[in-house]
């Protein structure tokens, strides 16, 4: 049986990376592909998460013996020596979920101005930019220059690179990765059998924001936009992060109109009866699983035109797209859907159709099998 080994820091759902690993592992196993998991740190739901894999072990234990898997896929590994060790153990691909491998600031936008970056990695320039972050144990000369450059060298030496969007493919080409080494594999999104239409299910209507509560996700921009609105609403915020306390203080003038629910490893229930999901991202979102997940539930989107959002937010069809950082335009777009539940429902239905056409199990499996046929001798033998 062909085998693949997923390697990531966490055993357990912390964000979209782990949710992607979990769902993809289940689909690949059903297709007859063995999937193992290696990790550095267990989370409270590690046992549930690891049940999606055939076998699991720590990274330290995995590197003590040869692997019988045909391909190793690194999802979140931030240590150069560890990347090298897995790379030297056999065919290795890197799944680029975000900007952390080529931006020592990790966010791929500039400090102070918070304008998005478009440059290729340069050890000196990017290291200096990273030093402008707030003081922390990680914000050191060694981490920003020497260690980061070593990590990027090891990552670039891997055999293949996997991304979720054409947007990220373009960024990797800009970073000097050969086009032939990059594979775009769209995620598979579950389509629920029934949805609650984003119409007058609640009064006032509910909006939803899901994701880590960090600056790059832009929830502060969403709160700024909400303060400009006159239409009643309730914003449900699902997620946690290091900006949570600041966001709660910022939301105080909005009173009961903003509710923080904390983290949810399976947020499907949060989509029920929601008028719109808002994607107020500041950073260039590499994909944003929450977008097509919302559409799968028949919920339209409102978001800033950054990153890979155009892969699923078709302006006027599956939601409303506004210029990056324009909180006044964001407020107007949200109010448009709050005022017109029929339009919101139509956009949600179109989004559900788009997801069912584009983000399918079969498309995901074709992508992974194509990758295996390139890198895995065992897969070549077992594929008709």
Per-region residue spans from a language model:
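Short acidic/histidine- and often glycine-rich active-site loop of Leloir-type glycosyltransferases
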Residues: 292, 305-316, 320-321
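Donor nucleotide-sugar binding/catalytic pocket of nucleotide-sugar-dependent glycosyltransferases
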Residues: 124-194
